[in-house]
């Protein structure tokens, strides 16, 4: 399968299954578009009609171009066969090794964000803080079910996890003890709204957290529209100075500023640029997922505006990078030479199998977005996964589980998309959230274009970097099995 598009002056041709990316001139772009369904003579005739007035386009040149395309096809870099579909059906037989937990240490929050999917941190239930006993058992559950995997991921989540900070510190200390006993390596992430950040929090996170996610929606008026406290006061003035101090002290350790855009700020690139201008360089901005009819929900009329915004963002990122003031955007971070291995590209995030969420009471759910839905209660941290039907359902959830994805060029980049978004949009985890698909495909086009621009600049310096699918992923490089 081949996908062709034009963006920022580049003619880009992507071969889906090999991962090869080709940057071609106008003539080659049109030849590739006709190649599969036309004879060489038909292609030459059509191209001469279109480009015949150009002195640099002759029939001989066109036939050479066709031969070059044929060579790429024979080399498996254009219209390469899809040899991965059978792998998708093997996943149901894989042993279930748990690699990561989203630990809901607080089902309460000190903000009252009206667009919050978790009903202001309560997940449509009672407010609660996780006890150390539950947290300790959750870590034991993870160790017991991780098999030979050494690197384990834990995300302290809420609600607002800093409302249970003392327990978090105690739990991390316990995990550090268990690492030595079981030959494990815990990588912690903290997701916080920033209100309770102080020197103690900063020092702890910079010592113990592999990554930190800091919630900010961008410009003051945008952030404060939704991210308010219970007295109705916006959080921007409170959290921005704290985030700046946090990031300054964090040095070269991982962090992300994470925002949400809604119908009210479809010009969300201005919020990203605002965060960059505040000094933040690791940025993410996610589309809100709301019920239809919600005032914040994205509409069909918003879609072309949003796609244009992603293009504006990509072009500005290239410009700022050349000026020495670049920043990272999470959804544009792709590695086209050594990225995720094919098992990961097919199976996605691993929710419901390798990754689960744990409530303050120790219940297990496929991920944080299913918490509180009795249909997706999988078991608990004492008895383990008892609702194996849910786990089996998620084992089948992959890039080949949806018939609509069969002929989609982006399927090996999205892995079939987010199961939770599909469920909330269609009622099925193997449904298709079409709005999200459109945004994802535009993000991928922009991300690939940025890589093309980077490679063009390297080529100008005499450095050639081929863009095609690598054979290993970061997990493999860490000595972990992806299968």
Region locations from a protein language model:
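Radical SAM/AdoMet-radical enzyme domain recognition
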Residues: 135, 139-155, 164-288
């Amino acid at each position: 399968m081949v996908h062709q598009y034009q963006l920022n002056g580049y003619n880009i041709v992507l071969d889906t299954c090999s991962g090869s990316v080709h940057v071609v001139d106008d003539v080659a772009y049109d030849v590739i578009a006709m190649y599969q369904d036309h004879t060489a003579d038909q292609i030459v005739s059509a191209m001469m009609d279109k480009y015949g007035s150009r002195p640099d386009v002759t029939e001989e040149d066109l036939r050479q171009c066709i031969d070059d395309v044929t060579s790429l096809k024979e080399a498996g870099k254009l219209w390469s066969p899809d040899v991965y579909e059978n792998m998708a059906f093997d996943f149901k037989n894989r042993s279930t090794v748990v690699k990561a937990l989203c630990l809901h240490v607080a089902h309460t929050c000190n903000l009252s964000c009206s667009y919050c999917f978790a009903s202001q941190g309560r997940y449509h239930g009672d407010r609660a803080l996780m006890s150390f006993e539950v947290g300790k058992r959750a870590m034991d559950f993870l160790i017991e079910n991780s098999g030979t995997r050494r690197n384990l991921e834990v995300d302290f989540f809420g609600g607002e996890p800093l409302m249970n900070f003392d327990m978090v510190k105690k739990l991390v200390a316990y995990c550090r003890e268990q690492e030595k006993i079981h030959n494990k390596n815990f990588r912690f992430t903290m997701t916080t709204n920033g209100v309770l950040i102080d020197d103690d929090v900063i020092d702890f996170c910079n010592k113990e957290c592999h990554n930190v996610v800091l919630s900010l929606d961008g410009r003051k008026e945008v952030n404060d529209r939704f991210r308010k406290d219970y007295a109705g006061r916006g959080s921007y003035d409170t959290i921005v100075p704290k985030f700046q101090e946090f990031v300054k002290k964090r040095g070269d350790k991982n962090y992300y500023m994470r925002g949400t855009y809604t119908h009210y700020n479809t010009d969300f690139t201005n919020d990203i640029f605002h965060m960059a201008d505040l000094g933040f360089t690791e940025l993410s901005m996610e589309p809100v997922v709301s019920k239809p009819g919600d005032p914040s929900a994205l509409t069909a009329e918003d879609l072309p505006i949003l796609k244009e915004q992603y293009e504006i963002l990509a072009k500005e990122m290239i410009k700022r990078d050349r000026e020495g003031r670049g920043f990272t955007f999470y959804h544009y971070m792709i590695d086209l030479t050594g990225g995720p291995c094919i098992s990961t590209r097919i199976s996605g995030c691993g929710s419901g199998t390798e990754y689960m969420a744990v409530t303050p009471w120790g219940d297990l759910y496929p991920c944080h977005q299913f918490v509180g839905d009795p249909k997706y209660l999988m078991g608990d941290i004492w008895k383990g996964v008892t609702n194996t039907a849910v786990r089996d359902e998620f084992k089948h959830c992959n890039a080949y589980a949806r018939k609509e994805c069969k002929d989609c060029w982006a399927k090996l980049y999205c892995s079939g998309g987010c199961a939770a978004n599909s469920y909330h949009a269609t009622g099925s985890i193997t449904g298709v959230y079409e709005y999200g698909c459109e945004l994802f495909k535009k993000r991928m086009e922009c991300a690939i274009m940025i890589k093309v621009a980077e490679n063009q600049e390297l080529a100008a310096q005499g450095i050639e970097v081929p863009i095609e699918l690598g054979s290993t992923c970061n997990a493999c490089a860490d000595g972990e099995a992806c299968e």
